[in-house]
């Protein structure tokens, strides 16, 4: 029971973190003030093509993360890391799994993903590559550092590519790969086509539908976004789905519908940061009615 409650709390906190990060890094009407808008964001919201990203150093990432936690937890991590370094090669995967879980429990997705990648390289199963790809995507979504984001996205892309090699029909692998392509690892429409194919075969696939919905918002296709998020809410209501629905309505000047969607997001999220944002947003929209 306690584990279920904790998992739900972590999911909600993570969802809000991703949502807030999305809101404040996209040039979408109503979400940023004119003076805060940037002019160098590529069309569609994807990352601009660049040179090969700098590799991620696991030791540096670990040290940075440990500096943010209490001494006892840091010591526990260090002890596991020392065990991993001293393990025989055939024992390293088991310790890497423990470290990946420990880092995930502490909400540090980057070192967790790096250890999962080690496991996947040693035990190349479909599930291992899917978990690795998902963790790198989580790290990508939660990270605002433009220097490390490309490397995280590339690693996610590589993990899902490896998963596709093992099972090219797997919807989770195809969805993950499509998301990385849409976000900058290729031509966005190629990624959209992959996600559309997933939804065609599995209309209730939340991950693929959410990705298509957010891309519709990023690219200014608000009518399509409304339909997509209405479908998502019919499958499984969530704070972020309602918020994105409100965003789409607002951008089309449908303020009454936007307010209703925003308030539904606030009710489901029960998050102070998002509640304050929504309260301010609702006040602003009521003045426009």
Where are the predicted features?
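N-terminal leader/linker segments that initiate helical-solenoid repeat arrays
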Residues: 2-110
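Short coil turns that delineate tetratricopeptide repeat
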Residues: 90, 123-124, 168, 203, ...
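TPR alpha-solenoid repeat register
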Residues: 95, 128-129, 173, 208, ...
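Canonical tetratricopeptide repeat
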Residues: 98, 131, 135, 176-177, ...
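Residue-level recognition of tetratricopeptide repeat
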Residues: 101, 121, 134, 179, ...
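Structural motif corresponding to the intra-repeat A-B loop/turn of tetratricopeptide repeats
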Residues: 106, 139, 184-185, 219, ...
């Amino acid at each position: 029971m306690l584990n279920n409650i904790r998992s739900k709390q972590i999911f909600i906190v993570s969802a809000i973190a991703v949502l807030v990060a999305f809101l404040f890094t996209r040039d979408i009407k109503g979400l940023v003030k004119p003076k805060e808008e940037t002019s160098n964001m590529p069309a569609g919201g994807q990352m601009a093509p660049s040179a090969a990203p700098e590799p991620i150093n696991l030791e540096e990432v670990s040290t940075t993360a440990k500096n943010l936690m209490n001494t006892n937890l840091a010591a526990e991590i260090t002890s596991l890391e020392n065990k991993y370094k001293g393990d025989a090669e055939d024992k390293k995967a088991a310790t890497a799994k423990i470290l990946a879980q420990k880092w995930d429990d502490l909400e540090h997705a980057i070192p967790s993903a790096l250890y999962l990648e080690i496991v996947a390289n040693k035990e190349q199963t479909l599930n291992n590559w899917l978990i690795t790809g998902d963790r790198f995507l989580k790290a990508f979504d939660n990270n605002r550092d433009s220097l490390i984001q490309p490397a995280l996205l590339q690693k996610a892309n590589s993990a899902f590519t490896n998963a596709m090699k093992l099972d090219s029909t797997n919807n989770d692998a195809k969805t993950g790969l499509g998301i990385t392509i849409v976000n900058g690892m290729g031509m966005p429409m190629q990624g959209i086509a992959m996600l559309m194919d997933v939804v065609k075969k599995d209309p209730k696939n939340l991950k693929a539908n959410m990705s298509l919905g957010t891309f519709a918002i990023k690219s200014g296709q608000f009518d399509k976004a409304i339909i997509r998020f209405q479908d998502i809410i019919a499958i499984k209501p969530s704070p972020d789905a309602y918020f994105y629905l409100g965003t789409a309505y607002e951008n089309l000047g449908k303020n009454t519908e936007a307010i209703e969607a925003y308030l539904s997001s606030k009710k489901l999220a029960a998050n102070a940061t998002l509640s304050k944002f929504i309260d301010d947003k609702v006040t602003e929209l009521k003045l426009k009615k």
